A protein has these predicted regions:
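Structural signature of extracellular appendage/secretion-system components
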Residues: 1-420
Length: 420
C-alpha cells in the first residue's frame, strides 16, 4: 500500500513531467519560424512499480528524454530533391543569360543608303545574304557594295561579340565555382565540429543534442543545394559525408574541396575541383545535382558546344563567301595578288617532297587545329584562273587540277603551263 509520502511523490513527479512537456511545447512555439528547427516532444516512462504483499502499486511517471520529431528517410529524400531543384533553378538562370546573348534586342547599323535593323543571328544572316543577293543583280553599284560590306561587318561583329560573351560567362561561372566551394568548405568544417559536440552531449546516455542535430541537418541541406552528398550516421551520433564516394567529412575531420586554376593556350582560365589531399578531381559526371552541378554542366558541356556551333557557323559563312567571291571579279582588275596565308619556304623548292596535304593540312608545332595551319582542309579538285586585259575586253579561262599528294612546286609548274 502506498503511503501518504509516496502519494505526494507520485504527484510531484507527475507535475514535473507535465511541466517538462509544457516547457517543450513553449520551446516549439518560440522556434516556429526558426530555419531548420525540428519539433520536439518529451518521452515519458512509468517508473518501476512498488511490489508489496498487498499488491503492486505504481510509482508515477518520469521524463526519460526530449527527442526531435525527425524522419531520417524523409530527410535524405529532401536532400535529394533539393539537389534536383537547385540544379534546375541554376541551369534556368544560366539559360536565361544565354538567351540574352543570342536573342539580343534590335540595334541599328549605319549605312550610306539606309539604317539597317538587325536582331539576333538569324536576322543578321538574312540581312547579310539579302545584301549579297541585291548586289548580284547590280554588281557595279557602289551603294550596294557598301551595304554588302556593312552587313558582313555587322554579322562578323555579332559572332565575335557572342563568342566573347560566352568566354565572359565562362569566367563568371569559374568565379561562382570558387565562391560555392568556399561555402561548402565552411559548412564542412562546422559539421565536423558539430559531430564532436553531439558525441560529447549524448555520451551521457538518454540526452539528445536536438539543437545541435538541427543545425547539422540544416548545413547538410545547404550543402545538398550546391552539390550531391551521401550521409551516413554512426553509433555515436556522428555523421560521415561523401561526394562521389569520397569522404569530405569523416567524424570530426573535414576534407575540404580545393579549387585549382590553370590557363589554356587561348588565355582562358580552367578551374577544377579536387577533394582535399587525396588528389581526386571532381568532374561534371560526378556532380550532376545542385547549383555546382549545373555550373559544371554549363561550363564544361553547354558553353563549349555553343562556342563550337558559332565557329562552325563562322567557318561555313566564310567558306561559302570566299568560294563565291573567288569565282568573281572586282571593278578594278588585279595585276598581282598576295595571299594572307604563308607556306614554308622549303615547300617551294623544286626538289621538295612536301605534299600539299602536308603543307596545308598537317598541324604546325603547337597548333590545336584539326585542319592544320589553314581554316579548311585542302581537297582533290580544281580551280579556275581568269586572265583579262586591262580593259576587261578579253578574258581567258584556265582550269588547274589539284591533288593533295602534289608538291607545291608541281602545282606552281602546272599553273605556269596552264596558258600553254
Amino acid at each position: 500500500m502506498v503511503s501518504l509520502f509516496g502519494i505526494l511523490n507520485i504527484g510531484s513527479r507527475g507535475i514535473s513531467a507535465s511541466q517538462a512537456s509544457l516547457d517543450t511545447t513553449a520551446n516549439n512555439i518560440a522556434n516556429a519560424n526558426t530555419e531548420g528547427y525540428s519539433r520536439q516532444r518529451t518521452v515519458q516512462q512509468t517508473l518501476d512499480p512498488l511490489v508489496t504483499a498487498n499488491g503492486v502499486f505504481g510509482q508515477g511517471v518520469n521524463v526519460v528524454t526530449v527527442e526531435r520529431i525527425r524522419n531520417r528517410l524523409l530527410e535524405a529524400q529532401v536532400r535529394e530533391a533539393l539537389g534536383d531543384t537547385n540544379f534546375n533553378q541554376q541551369m534556368g538562370t544560366i539559360l536565361a543569360q544565354l538567351e540574352s546573348i543570342f536573342s539580343d534586342p534590335l540595334h541599328s547599323v549605319s549605312s550610306t543608303t539606309e539604317t539597317l535593323y538587325a536582331g539576333g543571328l538569324n536576322d543578321l544572316i538574312s540581312s547579310f545574304f539579302r545584301a549579297f543577293q541585291d548586289l548580284s543583280t547590280t554588281p557595279d553599284s557602289p551603294e550596294l557594295r557598301v551595304a554588302a560590306i556593312e552587313s558582313a561587318q555587322a554579322l562578323a561583329e555579332s559572332i565575335v561579340s557572342k563568342s566573347q560573351q560566352l568566354i565572359t560567362l565562362r569566367m563568371e561561372l569559374n568565379q561562382q565555382i570558387g565562391t560555392q566551394v568556399q561555402t561548402i568548405n565552411q559548412a564542412l568544417q562546422e559539421i565536423a565540429g558539430l559531430n564532436g559536440a553531439i558525441r560529447s552531449v549524448e555520451a551521457g546516455g538518454n540526452r539528445n543534442a536536438n539543437e545541435l542535430r538541427d543545425r547539422r541537418d540544416l548545413l547538410l541541406r545547404q550543402i545538398s543545394e550546391l552539390v550531391p552528398v551521401q550521409v551516413e550516421e554512426g553509433s555515436e551520433g556522428m555523421v560521415r559525408v561523401s561526394i562521389a564516394g569520397q569522404w569530405i567529412v569523416d567524424h570530426t575531420s573535414a576534407n575540404p574541396l580545393v579549387v585549382e586554376t590553370s590557363r589554356n593556350e587561348d588565355g582562358i582560365d580552367l578551374v577544377g575541383i579536387r577533394i582535399g589531399g587525396q588528389g581526386l578531381h571532381l568532374i561534371d559526371n560526378e556532380v550532376r545535382k545542385g547549383k555546382l552541378g549545373a555550373i559544371l554542366e554549363a561550363r564544361d558541356r553547354l558553353l563549349p558546344a555553343l562556342s563550337e556551333e558559332l565557329d562552325v557557323l563562322a567557318r561555313g559563312v566564310i567558306f561559302e563567301v570566299n568560294r563565291l567571291h573567288s569565282a568573281s571579279s572586282g571593278l578594278v582588275g588585279y595585276s598581282a595578288i598576295r595571299s594572307s596565308l604563308d607556306v614554308p619556304s622549303r615547300a617551294l623548292d623544286s626538289n621538295s617532297t612536301m605534299t600539299l596535304n602536308r603543307v596545308f593540312n598537317e598541324p604546325a608545332p603547337g597548333s590545336r587545329s584539326a585542319t592544320g595551319n589553314r581554316p579548311y582542309p585542302i581537297q582533290d579538285g580544281e580551280f579556275t584562273i581568269r586572265v583579262a586585259d586591262s580593259g576587261y575586253q578579253k578574258q581567258d579561262t584556265y582550269s588547274v587540277k589539284v591533288h593533295t599528294d602534289d608538291t607545291l612546286a608541281a602545282l606552281v609548274s602546272r599553273i605556269d603551263r596552264a596558258d600553254g
